């Protein structure tokens, strides 16, 4: 390598390091207007956030409710939920295929575990194991439900402290 090549490489590395340092130290001073949404939280908590533990699915096909064991849902502890699924006219939904996902809208990350429906308890009740919330704040938990050839999703909001 020539001296000129080494000089170009060293200058480039120093420039990149200075830019990174400037970004890290100046962003908090410049404020959120210059920050990427992931750095400041992508969404504020809506003022009218629905925190109910029972409501209709997105397309109105199912009425779904949940309970946590223990109650309220703990932080940093794997726990279980029981969800109850009914048709819109109040009949228990048996043999549904249910998947679980969720996350923190303000932080842009999902759940730290992969909760699963592990047991059909009968009468429209299903056991969900592997629930965990690793930090306080606004969480969404979504259940995708398939039963009798119909598919729908229900989302529950929680604010954990």
List each language-model region with its residue ranges.
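Intrinsically disordered, low-complexity terminal tails/loops enriched in metal-binding residues
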Residues: 1-161
């Amino acid at each position: 390598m020539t001296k000129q090549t080494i000089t170009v490489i060293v200058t480039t590395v120093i420039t990149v390091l200075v830019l990174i340092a400037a970004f890290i130290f100046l962003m908090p001073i410049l404020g959120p207007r210059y920050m990427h949404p992931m750095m400041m939280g992508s969404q504020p908590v809506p003022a009218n956030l629905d925190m109910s533990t029972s409501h209709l699915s997105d397309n109105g096909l199912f009425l779904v409710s949940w309970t946590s064991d223990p109650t309220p849902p703990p932080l940093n502890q794997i726990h279980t939920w029981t969800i109850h699924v009914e048709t819109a006219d109040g009949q228990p939904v048996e043999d549904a295929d249910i998947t679980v996902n969720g996350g923190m809208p303000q932080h842009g990350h999902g759940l730290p575990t992969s909760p699963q429906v592990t047991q059909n308890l009968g009468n429209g009740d299903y056991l969900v194991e592997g629930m965990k919330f690793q930090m306080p704040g606004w969480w969404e938990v979504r259940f995708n439900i398939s039963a009798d050839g119909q598919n729908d999703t229900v989302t529950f909001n929680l604010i954990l402290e």
